From Swiss-Prot:
Cited SUPFAM superfamilies: S-adenosyl-L-methionine-dependent methyltransferases
Protein name, UniProt field: Protein-L-isoaspartate O-methyltransferase
Active site (record annotation): 67
Protein's organism: Cereibacter sphaeroides (strain ATCC 17023 / DSM 158 / JCM 6121 / CCUG 31486 / LMG 2827 / NBRC 12203 / NCIMB 8253 / ATH 2.4.1.) (Rhodobacter sphaeroides)
Job description of the protein: Catalyzes the methyl esterification of L-isoaspartyl residues in peptides and proteins that result from spontaneous decomposition of normal L-aspartyl and L-asparaginyl residues. It plays a role in the repair and/or degradation of damaged proteins.
Cellular component annotations (GO), alphabetically ordered: cytoplasm
Catalyses which reaction(s): [protein]-L-isoaspartate + S-adenosyl-L-methionine = [protein]-L-isoaspartate alpha-methyl ester + S-adenosyl-L-homocysteine
EC number: 2.1.1.77
Length: 219
């Protein structure tokens, strides 16, 4: 259902969408501008399309979800992306998070273990002319060593601990944002900064994400 079909003006819909995101703590002007430019509706298919502008997670293919917009904004904000940064996203999903990051970074690499998700996200990237995103089928728990090191890494699935291969692929001074914890319990969103010697860990907020699974999916 489009905004015109349900009687809502597109400009009003966008204002309502951004207000919901801001009210939940997303205050970074660049992140808000990126979320204003990227239409979440382009990444939501089927019967849930008319709920694309609500601040809620929604089911997508392969048993995955598209994160609620406020969480996308908060994770992007915590990542503190600079315009010249090279970013790795682990867990392409619908492609919405990578699209938002593409407005903040020089280059975005996004990987997913599900072929269908990579294919469908790539189609949307092409349709929206997002030319600085490369989507690949890969086991994200091992990162993307051929493109490392990265200025920023964003993980959109929960690990029991920050994955060692991903930590190793961060530049000195680089930042990784990752949900950590058991999948059957509330997890913590962690911000990891790589130092000259070791890493600094900061807990940000409770979250709930699907688990980070090793291997390549069959779909």
């Amino acid at each position: 259902m489009t905004a015109e079909a349900d009687g809502e003006d597109p400009a009003e819909r966008k204002m309502r969408f951004l207000f919901a995101v801001r009210s939940r703590g997303v205050t970074d002007a660049r992140v808000l501008a990126a979320m204003e430019r990227i239409d979440r509706g382009a990444f939501v298919r089927g019967i849930f399309a008319d709920r694309a502008y609500e601040d809620m997670p929604l089911p997508i293919a392969c048993g995955q979800t598209i994160s609620q917009p406020s969480v996308v904004g908060l994770m992007s904000q915590a990542l503190a992306v600079n315009p010249r940064d090279k970013v790795l996203e682990v867990g392409t999903g619908s492609g919405y998070q990578a699209a938002v990051l593409s407005q903040l970074a020089r280059r975005v690499y996004t990987v997913d273990r599900h072929r269908r998700l990579v294919r469908e996200a790539t189609e949307v990237f092409h349709r929206l002319s997002l030319t600085n995103i490369t989507a690949l089928i890969a086991d994200g728990s091992f990162g993307l060593p051929e493109q490392a090191p990265f200025d920023r890494i964003l993980v959109t699935a929960a690990a029991e601990d920050p994955p060692g291969p991903l930590l190793a692929q961060l530049k000195i001074g680089g930042i990784m944002v990752v949900p950590v914890g058991q999948t059957d319990a509330v997890q913590n969103l962690i911000k990891v900064t790589r130092l000259e010697q070791g890493y600094d860990y900061e807990e940000l907020r409770p979250v709930r994400f699907v688990p980070l699974v090793e291997g390549i999916g069959s779909d």
